[in-house]
């Protein structure tokens, strides 16, 4: 087991992500667009990516969620197998997925305080544990699965969708009732 504390712990997480051969499982409340794009690039290279995240915690994370959904839909519409399973949890179900868990190839697990954003990786003082012991990794994998299976996929707003239009109409109506 290794521990890292302070500014810059992102280098340890990024190194592990880049070394992935089979899969990466992620639980994080927020994911920046840059880090999201790196993960999506890994999926394009055949690395199976599973992400459990929250809906609308930050604007940037919301954009990352929309990009993920768009990639999945585009690949599905083109009958491509795209190894990205991206579960966005509605705040109505769980206000926030706050667990930060990163499992790489079932051989490394990282837990700690760092979200998947540049600020958390490079600017904030964060704490992570990097575990390689099979017993610890197995426990963390089982815990991740419990959390994953206890959550449902949320519908997310995509620009230009029917729901987006209905929300705009509701806002206009509310303005007239005041």
Predicted regions and their residues:
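Short beta-strand scaffold segments in enzyme catalytic cores
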Residues: 100-103, 129-130
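Signature of lipid phosphatidyltransferase scaffolds
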Residues: 108-178
